[in-house]
Swiss-Prot record:
Catalyzes the hydrolysis of inorganic pyrophosphate (PPi) forming two phosphate ions. Coiled coil: none annotated. Its EC number is 3.6.1.1. It holds the Pfam family Pyrophosphatase. Mg(2+) 2 binds at D70. Its main location: cytoplasm. GO terms for cellular component: cytoplasm. It is found in: Cytoplasm. Belongs to the PPase family. This is Inorganic pyrophosphatase.
């Protein structure tokens, strides 16, 4: 069984699986190759920055950019690339980059994995400093890469994240396999 066989969650869109590609604290961007199912080094970040939290995607989804729905998982520890985390969405960050709309879902580990975030139901309940770190990272992590840029537009709440997941699942069912 590979990642293509993994469902989008235990009870999506509220209870999702996230395949971790990039561990918290990494200065390397890893990416799962769709054809082989192997995680490749995409690039070393040109900036002296690191991913503030674990980063991955929801399997069997397709976002507007043609890739699976991206997720940043707020967590206490780095998680190995290729691991699957059961998560709960809490919101999303709308951005644009050189290729167009680039939305990032924000999630927390399911309470059975880590109860630390069980009281956080929406992105607005995260401490302001966490939201600022996330925003700062995405605004600056591509700065030294020729021709690349990012503009953070705004934070969206839980309901928008739920709709984004539903849309990603539907897009996948319509031919994203």
């Amino acid at each position: 069984m590979g990642y293509k066989d993994l469902p989008p969650g235990k009870n999506p869109p509220e209870d999702i699986y996230v395949v971790i590609e990039i561990p918290q604290g990494s200065g390397i961007k890893y990416e799962l190759d769709k054809d082989t199912g192997v995680i490749f080094v995409d690039r070393f970040l040109f900036t002296a920055m690191y991913y503030p939290f674990n980063y991955g995607f929801i399997p069997q989804t397709l976002a507007d950019d043609g890739d699976p729905v991206d997720v940043l998982v707020i967590s206490r520890e780095p998680v190995a690339p290729g691991s699957v985390m059961r998560c709960r969405p809490i919101g999303m960050l709308e951005m644009r980059d050189e290729e167009g709309i680039d939305t990032k879902l924000i999630a927390v580990p399911h309470e059975k994995l880590d109860p630390t975030y069980s009281d956080i139901k929406t992105v607005d309940q995260l401490p302001e400093i966490i939201r600022e770190r996330i925003k700062h990272f995405f605004e600056h992590y591509k700065e030294l890469e020729p021709g690349k840029w990012v503009k953070v537009e705004n934070w969206r709440g839980l309901q928008d994240a739920i709709e984004e997941i539903k849309k990603g699942i539907e897009n996948y069912k319509k031919g994203g396999k």
